[in-house]
């Protein structure tokens, strides 16, 4: 895949970063450090594979260190090499250096993490479901993929679609796109995108035409194709466990195209709608979307029309599972469905019928029935629901209920009424609901197809298959079996097609290759289902038996397959899971199936009485749905005498298999394109990938089999031209220069000259093929070679430059010597009298001549100036023409290339046509011969024709008789009706004989019904006979037409007959030979039978041994299970012992600590300590003994288990080898038996055939007749093919004529171009460099244009220099003339020097003109060469006239590209103007800073009020800190990104500083604003001082209050101890947080100082820029005085201005992006600062509580004085901290002075401070640890005076486990609190400094403060916010790299 530049990817718009890596990312990947020897993937149970680094290798074992830091030792076969970084996120996984499972998995994972969801894997495309919307299907993406080859664009479903479209047009072959995968993988979405693509690209210019021709359509064809999806999804899609929008039916959409590639029509075939979902759903699923759309109340008129409510729970059929789906808006979907119905042209009546039938199905589920008293008969339980359902279906409610409860059943020839139980009625209602819904769905598909059939001419189609994915549910029924079977068939088709194509590629290229069949892996499961005696066969057989049940079906399955087929298993019983009856091992996993109700589902019976009501319904739609329905009873009665095997009505499984076979036939007739959809995880989480799940799908989908072929074959392949161009640098001497050499031969020579294994590559016809990994080796060799070449080139260039410099130094030295010599000589003679006289007189002598020379020089100067102006004008004109010629040359090159490609294609097709022609001629010859043989049968055919004529006449007579019979029957019918009326009248009058009359009436009615049936049968016969008559007449006509031809064939047939007679004699002779052979074979057969009997006995013995071994295996397996259970029990006991040991250890540690802390207090405590210590030692010994015992037991069990496993493994291996050997021998014996049997059968057949050869001549005649018919069909096919070939030949002729015309046109264009080239020969200054650009594309052309522009500017500068020199000379001449006139004698020397200078300048000007002319001459030669090249190109064009149509297409595409680039140029100009406007708007941004500052003042007041409530948030803060840890982890990731952005922004700032020349006024305003900031900061400092004083006073009051309550606290000592435990834990956490915040503030100060240094440097750059501005102003004034140089100077300044504006625009955009990131980071900084403030209050509270305990201890203990001493020491430390704080205050004031000057850089400084967030946190944590160490050391020094203080300090840290308080602990608390008091004061001062720095951002703090208050509510949203930040960061990177 060629990597596109960011500029080329710009056409994809916002989708670019989701399709391909940016240039920056690709460069970073190539430069990323990588060690190919140690970087590997390692197999790991949890994550499947992990990235690791090899540490060591020893004895087949490898020790590695994983990414997570773990060290593993694995086998060498579990280690897989990692691909180099340049293959990261590769678009085609077949191109990877190392092909294996982990490489594919991690490539997909990394691309999925970057939201690149499409990836090629060789010949097909893999897509991973993103579970979120991505902007990769926008219209600009469709346009970008149109017409692109696969390798020209990133992987995408649009690329697959466009390739299929292009293949259809070029190969003239039907295409199909198979989108397969498991349920929930995204197949339906990709199907929509395919249809969207075709509907977009294939309708240009056709919409009006379609609208005109459609007439009745409500929308255009493309709209209708697109609208078919929403309608089908509403009625055919539902929520399942794995997919919210799962297609519950399969569809094959065929999109037909006309001859020009435009949309012609479309049709849809559907498969296996899951109609059971209408009445039943699982808990986590729901029914079809349409039910919930209707009840969404988006269209209230529907609710009223359908007589339903808006609550789905009111309807039993649709509320068994869930009723809402979060990802689907039912209201919007209803509008889309309703709109689709209108667009697809359904009539209003049909639309209403669809809704009414859907509502009726919902009402069906609510119909209630009950059992009659004392009977099993069911009766309606209310008629309200039935009335609604009947109303919606235009039925009579009473008739409907009667038909349900009392259906009429046909028994023999009579109909009787049958009673129904309640359950039977409910079953019938459910069946009717499913039938109505299914038939309505199929009717809608038929109507859609009618609407999409536009009757336009169509040639080829592209089919898109979207069928339900593989399903494994908790409850799997017949529907799931059918779906999974379909996927098995598709997977087998996929395997066969894809892998055969890959291997045929090798054969096509002429590479030796042994074919590997990968398509039979799934045959076992497929045969188990569909072959005779398979599951479907047994199911249909059971449906034939009236008394068959599910149990009998299951028993037959078990008898037939259980234990005989490896894919058929008995499921395991799992509690809580649905019952399963058998399991099948599919390619995607094992599925448990429940066969309940399969027989009924397969027969699909309906209540015929209700169906009859449907057929008579006034609703036309309902009546038409069931118009063709035939009852099972009628069919079964009719079939008894006709068929033996099955009924005439089709079962569901038979119909399914028929449709599936049709589908597979369709697919095999097309060229398929495969898209494999992958589910990344089971939880539908965007961005998450489960390794095992993905690997399972990759194995099932054939991805890894494809890689297996790549590993065996040659996955890397390069065209010879590309290989020569790229790798020629490896050995340039291998390819001779200056002579033509074929690319293939050059590649062969090049590879032969390189030291690589020759078996690792193969040469094909057009490509060179490489084994996996070799291409990576070649790339490394190429990189090394390029490095050497570049180093050598640099050395040569440096040497050349130094030599040039040395020559210049020598020339200057010689010039100095010459000048010095002449000056010395002149100084010696200038005072001579004669010389003075000479100086005075000589000018007078030549004054007149000088004037003439001056005049002449002026004229020459003027002429030179005019010529220069003309030259400039011509040069501009030539430059314009040159650009045109360059474009034309590029166009011609593209045309030549495209025509060459087209010519190659045409030649290939021509060769294929010639081959086909030869084959067809051979076939024609063969057919002709056969046709001659068929003439012999002509007489018989003539006789048959006469016989058929007689039969026709007889049939006509029969038809006449039938018509008479029909009339007679009609009369009898009328007579019968009259008789019935008479009988009815007699019945009214004769009550006495009513019984007899009733019987007679019944008999008459039956006779009447029989008559009607007979009449219907006769009518059917009449219709059949009419059709037969028509068919026979057509056959007669055909026979008459072929009569003449067969007469001609008769003679040849007679000759063939004679030939057959000769063959008969030969056959009789061979019969005798066969008899002899038979006798020999009989003898051999007897021997073989004897051997077979021996082998069979041997096999039986081995089978007995095998059975014994299997029993032994089972026993060993049971023993293994017992051992495993023992191991598990031992593990459990060991875990329990470990837990007891840990508990004992913890208790012992607590006891020891208490003993140590209480040691020395009293003698009782000492004794208790000794006892507890003894107990502790005893417990420890017991624990160690128990541990050793457990370890020994576990080791013994492990050893036993390992030995058992090894022994079993050896036995199993031996058994497997024996079994394989026996199976092999068995198969060989079977083959021999089959061969012998076949030979015997062949001999017997040959004997019988030879004996009856004479009698078989008649059979041969009949066979010849069949052959004649076949030949006739072949002749017709050949005739059609010949016509098609003639049409194609005519088309080719027309194309040749068009190309001839185009060639002549191009010749004329060539002549015109030649004339233009001759006119432009004189002054093409830049043609030399443009020559090189002709070999490159538009990128190189731009580069050449830049070079031309630079040279043009150099010429302009030279011209300006000449003009300045001439003007200066003119001024000097005028001065000299004036001086000469006043004092000619005295100024002779000066005039002479002026003359010399003037002459020298004129000479320089002439030399420059000559140089220009020389360049023009050089360019004339170059132009001549260009002309020759153009002529060569024109010759190439003439040779490529066979593909001119493709040339026109390429030309139009290139014109589009040029137009796009022109548009981009215009856009660039517009952006330049816009940037000038943006420069004026910069001043407004400065006011934003001021507004932000004012908002910060308001925030200060808000924060003051909020600080009063912080006391109540301590408990919340503890939880928030834990959550903050997670956020810090995310911040660390963000920090890395921000650091990278900081570097980019810093570089951009350096560029942007040049654009600040015009910002002096802004700087002044900023200084004024900073003065205001300073005053505000001073005021805030004063306010903070007041707050600190207030806090001190509050603390004093609290201390006094604590002293007064000391006695009360002594009584509540135990309670205080418990409180203190919690407080101490909180105190430690708060101290850490305070230290963290304090260090963050200190680090911010340090970073701020660094930033000040940077800003000072920036100020210096600004000063330099200002000085540069003054210089520019002076230069501008000089330019204005020089009118003749004005234009050149203006152009220079304009170019400078444009560059400056672009830099400023880039910098401003980057500054805006950076400010957004700064805002985000400010919020995080705010979190830390606010936390710090809360912690200050928390510490003060904790301090007050701790001081209460301290006061109590001071009065109770004698050693409180030592704690006071320690407090004094801490006071000294406090003083030191105060001094430090004062020093920091002075530094702060100095910094504020600097801030005043550079306020507008404050955001960047804060960003720099915040970007080091993680490092600051680490430093702060380190500092916290240092301070804790200092505290501990200080406590140790204090412990010298107080024994045991150190133990008490440790005890304070573990207060949670302490139950008693003693005096030593109080002393330690006193010390700790004193230190905390000092620290708090220091922290407050430092917090003030941090707050002063952050006060400009306080307005931004409000947002995060609010987030902290609602932390618990936002916990679930935190991760999504981090993801958004990542996406935003990527967009910023993308924008920066793009700009």
UniProtKB/Swiss-Prot annotation:
Residues 660-682, 762-776 are annotated as: Actin-binding. Its main location: cytoplasm. Residues 35-84 form the Myosin N-terminal SH3-like domain. ATP binds at residues 181-188. The gene is MYH8. Muscle myosin is a hexameric protein that consists of 2 heavy chain subunits (MHC), 2 alkali light chain subunits (MLC) and 2 regulatory light chain subunits (MLC-2). Keywords: Actin-binding, ATP-binding, Calmodulin-binding, Coiled coil, Cytoplasm, Methylation, Motor protein, Muscle protein, Myosin, Nucleotide-binding, Phosphoprotein, Thick filament. This is Myosin-8. The modification Phosphothreonine is found at residues 66, 71, 421, 1242, 1256, 1266, 1287, 1468, 1502, 1518, 1731. It is found in: Cytoplasm, Myofibril. The modification Phosphotyrosine is found at residues 391, 426, 1465, 1493. InterPro entries: Kinesin_motor_dom_sf (IPR036961), Myosin_head_motor_dom-like (IPR001609), Myosin_N (IPR004009), Myosin_S1_N (IPR008989), Myosin_tail (IPR002928), P-loop_NTPase (IPR027417), XRCC4-like_C (IPR014751). The modification Phosphoserine is found at residues 627, 1093, 1097, 1163, 1238, 1244, 1262, 1293, 1304, 1307, 1475, 1496, 1515, 1555, 1575, 1601, 1604, 1715, 1727, 1740. Pfam families: Myosin_head (PF00063), Myosin_N (PF02736), Myosin_tail_1 (PF01576). It comes from the Eukaryota.
